[in-house]
Amino acid sequence: EELFAAHEPDILCLQEAETMSLPARVGDLALAQSTTRNRLGLAVYYRDAMLRPTAVRAVALKKSMHDRVLRPAHERLVGVRFRELTSGRDFIVASFHAAPLTALNSLRRHQIRSALLELQLLGPGLPTLMVGDYNYPIFKDNLSEKVRDHGYELTLSDARTYTRYKFFRGHYDFATSAGFDIQTISTLPQGVSDHLPILIDAQLDSPAEVAQVAEAI
C-alpha cells in the first residue's frame, strides 16, 4: 500500500505475493486476478475507475528442475485483458515470473516465448505488456534479439533491480512489450522484497502503429 500511495499506478503487477492473504483492494486498485495453486504467486491489480478486465488467464509454463523437486510454483504467468473505459481500446498486461537461476537460460527463453504466445490467446494482435522477474541478469542482448524476432521489445529499468549479493547483482525485473510506447522504466527504492520494484510509464501506440506491430507477432 505504501508503494501505491507513493506512485499511484494504474496497474500493479506482483510476483512472490502471499496469495492467500491478498486484499481485494489496494487503495484505488482492485484485484483482477491472482494465482491460486501456490502460496507465493502472482497478482494483477487495476484502477477500476479507468479500466475494466474482460478476460484473464493464469498459466503454468514449462517446469524447471527446481519446480519439479521443490514445487514452489505452478503458474508463472497471470495475464489480464483490459478495456480502457474512456477510449474503448483493449490491451493486455501480465505479471510474469521465470524459473530461478538454477535453471538454464534456454528454459527461461522457452518460458518467455510460451508466455507471450499464451497472452495472444486473450486477444490476437492486441497491445501487450508483460512485466516481472525474468531471472535473466546476463546475456540480455541475446534475449532482446530473440524477443524482437517475435515482434516484441525488451526494455530495462534505469538501474539494477537486485543488489543484495554482489555476484548476483543485475537487472532481473524488466518488461517485454508490443504496441506500447515505453516512456521510462524506473527502479524504485527497495521495500520488503529482495528485489527492487520498477515503475513503468507507458502509453498505447496509435491504432495504426498497433496494426503494424500485430502483423509481426
Residue ranges and their predicted role:
Residues 21, 56, 81, 119-129, ...:
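Metal-dependent phosphoester-hydrolase catalytic domains
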Residues 4, 11-90, 188-189:
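Structured beta-strand-rich core segments of catalytic domains in phosphoester-bond hydrolases
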Residues 6-8, 50, 87, 122, ...:
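Alpha-helix termination/capping residues and helix-transition junctions
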Residues 1-26, 89-91, 113, 128-129, ...:
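N-terminal, active-site-proximal structural segment of metallo-dependent hydrolase catalytic domains
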Residues 2, 79, 110-118, 171:
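Alpha-helical elements of Rossmann-like donor-binding domains used by nucleotide-donor carbohydrate transfer enzymes
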Residues 104-126:
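A long, amphipathic alpha-helix that forms part
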Residues 15, 96, 131-133:
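Active-site flanking residues adjacent to catalytic metal/cofactor-binding acidic residues
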Residues 87-106:
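Metal-dependent phosphoester/phosphodiester hydrolase catalytic core
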